[in-house]
């Protein structure tokens, strides 16, 4: 596996935030393979700041990277910078959240985000014959938008399921708590919360506990993160999470990167399926780590 050429291949990676173990898990997979090849990976954390991410990309380009792996903070404001990267002859792979103009990029590796939302909605409709639903969103990330749309489209034709409120929380636990509190303070009654990811579901759980609603409200997330899997087994309020596999996303990303560099054929779009984890099938999963 070791790179016998004298030239080390340089990879640059920037994820919307490293304040989410999901992205750490994606990056670890990539890093392992890069290290095995004797190549180099530079990883950057823009901490949800699109301007900072643009600067980091320019910095990575100046380090002489051959491939940029990007998980965009915002799906459209990044396009201008990516065009410059492309002009410099650098390969661009987008992971987990697409960019709005996929003509600029060489490959997009994502979970089936729309289906993740569909799975949660279908499970909810099987469990409850009617529901008033609050949504916690991240409107600037296309992956999150796809999940919310999958959920909304599934319940849209059935009047027993009403979406009664929604707030943006950037997919962060510490912003999800006040976001759901805001819906509660508006006097809106709801019995289900659909969260764009598991960190958001943690914030939602904290909010319903704070407001003594943990026996009346049920929460769905997306990710299949270790802490939500543990809570699925232990709490009544967390009902399900549509699980992504950051290990698969990382493996697919770096596999396609080396294919490009070796001028082999590759797919421009790779979609990794998601699976719903519930109380009924939680024993089948390792709750200490990611899948």
State where each predicted segment sits.
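Hinge/cleft segment of the Venus flytrap/periplasmic-binding protein
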Residues: 1, 154-155, 245-291
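Hydrophobic alpha-helical segments within soluble ligand-binding/sensing domains
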Residues: 53, 109-133, 145-146, 173-180, ...
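Short, solvent-exposed amphipathic alpha-helices that sit
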Residues: 22-39, 116-120, 143-161, 175, ...
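Flexible loop/hinge segments that line or gate small-molecule binding clefts
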Residues: 75-115, 126, 132, 225-234, ...
């Amino acid at each position: 596996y070791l790179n016998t050429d004298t030239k080390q291949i340089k990879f640059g990676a920037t994820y919307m935030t490293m304040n989410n173990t999901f992205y750490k898990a994606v990056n670890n997979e990539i890093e392992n393979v890069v290290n095995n090849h004797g190549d180099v990976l530079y990883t950057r954390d823009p901490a949800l700041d699109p301007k900072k991410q643009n600067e980091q990309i320019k910095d990575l380009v100046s380090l002489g990277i051959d491939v940029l792996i990007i998980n965009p903070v915002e799906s459209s404001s990044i396009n201008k910078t990516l065009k410059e990267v492309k002009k410099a002859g650098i390969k661009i792979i987008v992971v987990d959240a697409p960019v709005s103009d996929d003509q600029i990029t060489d490959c997009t590796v994502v979970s089936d985000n729309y289906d993740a939302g569909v799975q949660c909605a279908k499970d909810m409709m099987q469990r409850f014959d009617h529901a008033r639903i609050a949504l916690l969103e991240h409107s600037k990330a296309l992956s999150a938008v796809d999940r919310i749309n999958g959920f909304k489209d599934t319940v849209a034709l059935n009047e027993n399921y009403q979406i009664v409120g929604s707030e943006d929380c950037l997919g962060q636990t510490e912003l999800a708590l006040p976001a759901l509190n805001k819906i509660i303070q508006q006097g809106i009654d709801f019995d289900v919360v659909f969260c764009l990811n598991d960190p958001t579901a943690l914030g939602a759980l904290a909010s319903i506990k704070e407001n003594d609603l943990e026996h009346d409200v049920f929460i769905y997330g997306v990710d299949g993160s270790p802490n939500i899997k543990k809570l699925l087994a232990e709490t009544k309020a967390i009902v399900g999470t549509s699980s992504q596999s950051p290990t698969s996303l990382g493996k697919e990303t770096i596999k396609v990167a080396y294919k490009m560099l070796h001028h082999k054929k590759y797919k421009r779009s790779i979609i990794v399926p998601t699976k719903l984890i519930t109380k009924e099938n939680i024993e089948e999963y390792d709750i200490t780590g990611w899948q």
